[in-house]
Curated annotation (Swiss-Prot):
Keywords: Membrane, Transmembrane, Transmembrane helix. May act in meiotic drive. InterPro entries: WTF. GO terms for cellular component: cytoplasm; membrane. It is a multi-pass membrane protein. This is Wtf element wtf7. It is found in: Spore membrane. Residues 1-21 are annotated as: Disordered. The gene is wtf7. Its main location: membrane.
Length: 215
């Protein structure tokens, strides 16, 4: 009985085994994926296998451009449900640029003159009504200790109305000032309609107070 035996020359030969079709099999990565040949057979693919994870988290950092810093979170892989790959939550942060903060309320910032004018214009629309109201109270030598329960309730409604009106006027300053320049008559009617509940509250509050003081 005769046969040929080729001794192993190098330890690297132990990591590869030649099959009948002369394709190497990597013992660490496993078998190559099978590809269809068209006639019903399969042959090992030449391309390496692709592995899709269940969750892909992509974070694109643009250090030189803080406006383009985007964090993308994809909870599903492309191999899963097709529509689920479109679920992308993007959160843009602008850390080094104070002017581009999304949520901010800065009445007095670097452009404090502009924001100060906006705040002054918003409050100026309510000052005449408050001035008349408190002037009447001080003229009659009114005191907050003389207020009844209904008086305090009406006073709270009046303060809440003034606060909400000032906040809305400040938040939408560009919109209502542009509308006031273009359509001044309509703006006057709308402004009066918005402040009418506060005016009525002021009159009723003052009437109840005068009635409690002088019968």
């Amino acid at each position: 009985m005769s046969g040929s035996y080729a001794p192993i020359e190098d330890s690297a030969d132990e990591l590869s085994v030649h099959s009948g079709n002369d394709n190497e099999i990597d013992l660490e990565k496993g078998l190559l994926p099978k590809c269809n040949t068209g006639n019903g057979g399969t042959t090992p693919c030449s391309e390496p296998p692709h592995y899709d994870s269940d969750a892909v988290v992509e974070m694109d950092m643009y250090e030189n451009n803080i406006y383009m810093r985007t964090f993308k979170l994809r909870p599903f892989a492309k191999s899963g449900v097709t529509n689920s790959s479109n679920v992308v939550f993007q959160m843009k942060t602008y850390e080094n640029n104070r002017h581009m903060q999304t949520f901010r309320l800065r009445p007095f910032a670097k452009n404090g003159v502009t924001n100060g004018v906006k705040l002054a214009q918003s409050l100026f629309l309510l000052l005449p009504f408050n001035f008349i109201f408190f002037a009447c109270l001080f003229f009659r030598k009114a005191s907050f200790t003389d207020f009844s329960l209904m008086g305090w309730i009406l006073f709270g409604i009046w303060c809440l109305t003034c606060f909400l009106s000032s906040f809305i006027l400040y938040a939408y300053h560009e919109s209502w000032t542009k509308f006031a320049r273009e359509r001044s008559q309509e703006f006057s009617l709308i402004l009066f309609g918005l402040l009418f509940p506060g005016i009525v509250t002021m009159v009723v509050f003052y009437a109840l107070y005068m009635r409690s003081m002088y019968g």
